[in-house]
Every structure is written in C-alpha cells, then in structure tokens.
Amino acid sequence: MTYKIVSKYIKDLSFKIPGAKSYFLLEKNIRNHRVKIDVTSKKLKENIIEIDTNLYFEPKEKDKDNFKISILFSSLINYEKKIEDKELEKIVLIEVPTAIYPDVKKIVSLLFEKSGFNKFNLPEMNFQKLYETKKN
C-alpha cells in the first residue's frame, strides 16, 4: 500500500439557476458549456493529505443570467512515509482524482436530473493526460 483514501466528502456545492430564463437557456445550450477542474492539496499531519477536487460546469460565455454549478469534493489520504515526492505528486494529481471522479460525476448528474434535465452526463476525465499536458 502506497496510500489509502481514508475519507471523501462534499466540502462545498453550488447549483444555482437564477430563474426561468437561465433554466431554458441552459436546457437549450447545454452543449455550449465546459467543465473545468482544479486539484489542490495540503498536508494536514504527518502522512495525511487533504486533496480538494474542484469541478466547475460553466457556459463558455459569461452572462449575468447564467447558472453557476460547482462542487468541491475533498479526499483525505494516508500515505507511506518513504514515498518519493514525484510519486506523491502523481497520487495527488492523477490517482485520487481518477478514483473519486465517478462519485463527483454521479452527484452532479443527480442534481441535473432532479432539476429537470434528463440524461445529463459529465464527460469522462483523463487525469493522466491532464497531468502530462500541464507538465509540458
């Protein structure tokens, strides 16, 4: 065992549709939106790191009538003392986000479904590819 996810939870959640106009614009133009993801971490104790995965679903063009959807999903991991920094970086930026993304996806999809949007599904994310792109 190099690391173990000991806890995961929703730290913050925002699903705001300002009104009927926003609702119908979103329904009509849902394909004209993008998903942004930001992963940050901080060491809490020896061998324990909190990893925050922030997901934003937003329109490509900003407008005062636009909705705001974001989820901050936190994971606590316990890792071995002898782990190298490079390996720990990959755990934080690739492995943990990959492991928790199905939960985030399910939560966001359920919010959309319960808000009247049928068959909404977030795209798959390749955190390995995102990591490699950011490194170059």
PLM region descriptions:
Residues 1-136:
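N-terminal intrinsically disordered, cationic/polar leader segments
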